[in-house]
Amino acid sequence: MEHPIAPLNVYGASKAAGESAATAWRKHYLLRTSWVVGEGKNFVATMASLAERGVDPAVVADQWGRPTFTQDLAEAALHLLFTGATYGTYHVSNSGEVITWADLARAVYTGTGHDAARVSNTTTEEYFADAQVFAPRPANSALDLSKLIAAGFTPRDHRDALAEYLHQLGRARED
């Protein structure tokens, strides 16, 4: 397998089954992504709302990755389709430094004009200690973007994408 997978829960297993079905076709593009941020409810929008409401959240600091903003995901897909890139599996996320969920929350607080120190760190174990249902997540969700870049698409740095997203989110709240 080009990019091996190891599902940690039922959701992951269902995604793996979908990948298996999709890759049965010789001509396919399979896009793997993580930490998706777009319209509607998502982690970044939730953190922006908490910041505005004066909430000081404890956020997981032992899971690593990079966000994927939906605009960039769509642009990557269109690039692959319209440039005739080699068929196969591509990892798609924004580029830049690998961060934790807590780092991302602090960036949201800063980007919305709030004190990032209001965000405290917690562990995955502590965060879900009282949860009735817990779906394990990988500790490191950072994706290798080298194949996507070799196909001619360089994703934006997640910090730039976040700044644009927060600007749009602020404008939407003003309307």
Residue locations for each model-derived region?
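Mid/C-terminal beta-alpha module of Rossmann-like enzyme folds, strongest
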Residues: 76, 83-133, 164, 170-175
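Short aromatic/basic micro-patch
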Residues: 12, 30, 67, 98, ...
